[in-house]
Amino acid sequence: MLVIPAIDLQSGRCVRLKQGRFDQVTQFSVFPIERALHFAKLGAKRLHVVDLDGARSGKMQQLELICSMQKTGIPIQAGGGIRSIEQALECSNAGISQLVIGSLAITNPDLTIQIIEKIKPENIVLALDVRVDTKVPLLAINGWQNNSTSSLWEVVSYYENYGIKNILCTDIACDGMMNGPNFDLYQQAVEYFPQIAWQASGGVRHMQDITTLNSLGISAVILGLMLYQDNVNFEELLC
């Protein structure tokens, strides 16, 4: 299983949100390029970078910074505001390894399919963020500011027909809380769609959580707030 450090960007700085709330932001003193270089030196195989300003505004705002981060030698999957073919091509042509498409996949499937066809499915990660208030996980959009009526399973089934294999799934209630992932959700995901390379995000606290996700068949785990804790040895997590 791939262990992927996450870096959230806001106004050029590293931040973390609690449960996706923009009014609950923690800003860190380390600069994004330094953080990327740190993970590259430790042996990370990929970075997950989110432009929070882009996610909120609908257009990626920090592409130049993200490209500078990738120059540290670590491939990046990046998202936050990729909501047009032009923006997707700009990111791809700038050298971003994989584009993370979120809200657009729910609000504009036709445009999303055009992007998939242009960029190729293997270069796309669909980021599907859910609220599990009922038995059915429903998707949130626009930086988690709004809820949709689409279920996770409906959307995955739809895009599977267009060659999508990489899906990043976050239970919003777990994100930034350090209370553990939603294991039941990921177990269901793998059971329903075993051919999808699932990336789990939200709530991971320690090595045991990672081990459990691996045992469920999850392909990758995204680590955010956990990596800002003083007692975490990232090199050990890679083993």
UniProtKB/Swiss-Prot annotation:
The Gene Ontology terms for molecular function here are: 1-(5-phosphoribosyl)-5-[(5-phosphoribosylamino)methylideneamino]imidazole-4-carboxamide isomerase activity
Spell out the subcellular localization from the entry. Answer: Cytoplasm
The UniProt entry, under InterPro entries, shows: Aldolase_TIM (IPR013785), His_biosynth (IPR006062), HisA_bact_arch (IPR006063), Isoase_HisA-like (IPR044524), Isoase_HisA-like_bact (IPR023016), RibuloseP-bd_barrel (IPR011060)
Alphabetized UniProt keyword annotations: Amino-acid biosynthesis, Cytoplasm, Histidine biosynthesis, Isomerase
UniProt-listed Enzyme Commission number(s): 5.3.1.16
* Pathway per the UniProt entry: Amino-acid biosynthesis; L-histidine biosynthesis; L-histidine from 5-phospho-alpha-D-ribose 1-diphosphate: step 4/9
Principal EC category: isomerase
Gene3D superfamilies according to UniProt? Aldolase class I
Gene Ontology CC terms: cytoplasm
Top-rank lineage group of the source organism: Bacteria
GO:BP terms for this protein? L-histidine biosynthetic process; L-tryptophan biosynthetic process
Q: What is its main location?
A: cytoplasm
N-terminal signal peptide: none
Which residues act catalytically here?
8, 129
Keyword match Transmembrane helix:
no
State the reactions this protein catalyses: 1-(5-phospho-beta-D-ribosyl)-5-[(5-phospho-beta-D-ribosylamino)methylideneamino]imidazole-4-carboxamide = 5-[(5-phospho-1-deoxy-D-ribulos-1-ylimino)methylamino]-1-(5-phospho-beta-D-ribosyl)imidazole-4-carboxamide
The UniProt similarity line reads:
Belongs to the HisA/HisF family.
Q: Which HAMAP family match?
A: HisA (MF_01014)
Which protein are we looking at?
1-(5-phosphoribosyl)-5-[(5-phosphoribosylamino)methylideneamino] imidazole-4-carboxamide isomerase
Give the species this sequence originates from.
Legionella pneumophila (strain Paris)
